[in-house]
Amino acid sequence: MALNLTVDIDKDSGFCFGVVYAIDMAEEILEEDGYLYCLGDIVHNDEEVARLKAKGLRIIDHAALPDLKNEKVLIRAHGEAPETYRIALENNITLIDASCPVVLKLQNRIKTSYDQDEKILIFGKHGHAEVIGLQGQTNNEALVFQDIAELDQVELPASFTLYSQTTKSVDKFYAIKDELIKRGYEVKANDTICRQVSNRYEDLGAFAKQYDKVVFVSGKKSSNGKVLFEVCQKANAQSYFISDPAEIDPTVFTANDRIGICGATSTPMWLMKEVKAALEAL
């Protein structure tokens, strides 16, 4: 028996402007040249990466970059460390720089702090592409932590400058700042969180509350997806995380449910539309 679900897609979900810019740039060159190298996944969404690979996108890692000569290589929205630009120059590689302007601004601020001999802490995910690029601005001397508990084991300087990965939670950032000040440190905090991402937290919570159930669509590698899914769960306990329509579990829905679909800033709208069609077919 058909479940007769009413399904809406959150109009504010989908790619942020930084990702749109990188993908538009890639598609333009793929159309002209038929292929393009990209340093790391262009976006943390396997389905979108597969779509672009089919058009000729070739994903390489940093270890493969020194072996390339006289090629075009796309730098994705996450940005890159100075070392990448140095290798490109040596190997006559044309960099198609699609670094997000918000990330570039943050890189410049961190570089300025480092040049002024400030001690730098970065609230961010270990090993994340953006964070690696940020650390590169400090000759990898900045201390990265993703949870304040990590700092319990570290001897911190009496004063330091605190930065954040652009997709982190604003509330968590300020809670960390307040806690560090409470512990007696002199903290110069730079709120460098992208407002297109942070504004989604509030809007997404309001969206999730309107529905019986929420289906959140995101790549499993997306940091932003993890944070936004937590927002959904907080607003609506019946929120379900999937990466593609094949992961839909029909048993969690009941007849005439009102379903809201939303996603990360790395989730393509076409994928959310496929999920909508799959839910409406149940």
Q: Model-found features: residue ranges?
A:
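The feature marks the mature, well-folded catalytic cores of soluble enzymes
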Residues: 1-282
